[in-house]
Each structure stands twice: as C-alpha cells, then as structure tokens.
A protein has these predicted regions:
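Feature captures hydrophobic
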Residues: 1-159
Length: 159
C-alpha cells in the first residue's frame, strides 16, 4: 500500500532550458531558414497526402536559434503576435496546404528551435519525442485539441 503525500513537491528555483538533447549535440550547424523552408515544403507535401482533416486547421511554425529564446516565449501570453512565422499551412485534405490559407477552425502556432525542427524533419527524432520532452511550445487559437492535426504533425517529415 502506498502512502498519501502530505507535502508538495519542491519546485526547482531555476528550470534550465539548456539541456543537451541528442539532436542539439549531433548537429554542428544551425540550419538556415531557407533550408528549413525547403524541408518543410517536402514534409508538408508528404503529410498532406495522408491527411484526414476535413476542416481548415492551420499550423504556423516559428523558429529560433538561441535555446534561451524559449524563456521569452514562455513569458509572453501571445508570442505569435510578436513573431513572423517561417511558414503557415493548412491540414485540410481537400485544400492546397500552402495556397489555401483561409479562416481556420483551429490555428496552432508552433515555436521550435531551428536545430530541433531540422532533426524532426530529417528523421533524427520524432514529433512524439518532442511533445513528451517539451521541446516545442504550441499556442492554439481557440485552445481545442484536434486529433487530425496531431496525426498530420506525426507525418510531417521528409522520410
């Protein structure tokens, strides 16, 4: 039998975001915005062919190079209003994912380190690993979970 905890866990005073992830130490370069965009176009084409989304669900991806930038994202209530996305695309299987950016039912804004995005798009890691490890931050408008969007994201890679 287990005992009930009477005291709360003690929170650390500082949460380090400089953890050396495998993808961070494996990549000896910071991927350029143009390289990431080319990989995203290929990945979106691949994921769109497997899409099950029937409505306009949009993703916008924002990248940053400095791992400490995540602190600014955490401390801002609507960071998407202060940033320019690298790309915005539609998950709707009946639309052109790049050209048909209409009013959306849900719009998810993903904030991710450039190296992490490169690693997930090239198969070094997988989106599910990032979700568990809190590697990227998402702001949904409205804040509703849509399973077909998550499924789309799981196929978002070039391999």
């Amino acid at each position: 039998a287990s005992r009930e905890r009477k005291e709360f866990y003690k929170y650390p005073k500082i949460i380090k975001c400089e953890k050396d992830y495998f993808w961070r130490t494996s990549l000896s370069f910071i991927p350029s915005q143009s390289l990431l965009k080319r990989l995203l176009f290929q990945s979106i084409k691949r994921a769109h062919s497997k899409s099950e989304a029937l409505s306009n669900y949009l993703f916008s991806i924002y990248t940053y190079d400095d791992p400490l930038e995540i602190n600014n994202i955490f401390s801002t209530s609507k960071p998407q209003e202060k940033s320019i996305p690298l790309i915005t695309f539609n998950c709707n299987k009946d639309c052109n994912p790049i050209e048909d950016i209409h009013e959306s039912v849900i719009h998810s804004h993903i904030f991710i380190e450039s190296k992490a995005l490169f690693a997930v798009l090239t198969g070094i890691t997988h989106w599910n690993n990032y979700e568990v490890g809190s590697v990227y931050q998402v702001r949904r408008v409205p804040d509703k979970f849509e399973p077909t969007m998550q499924a789309f994201l799981n196929f978002l890679s070039v391999i």
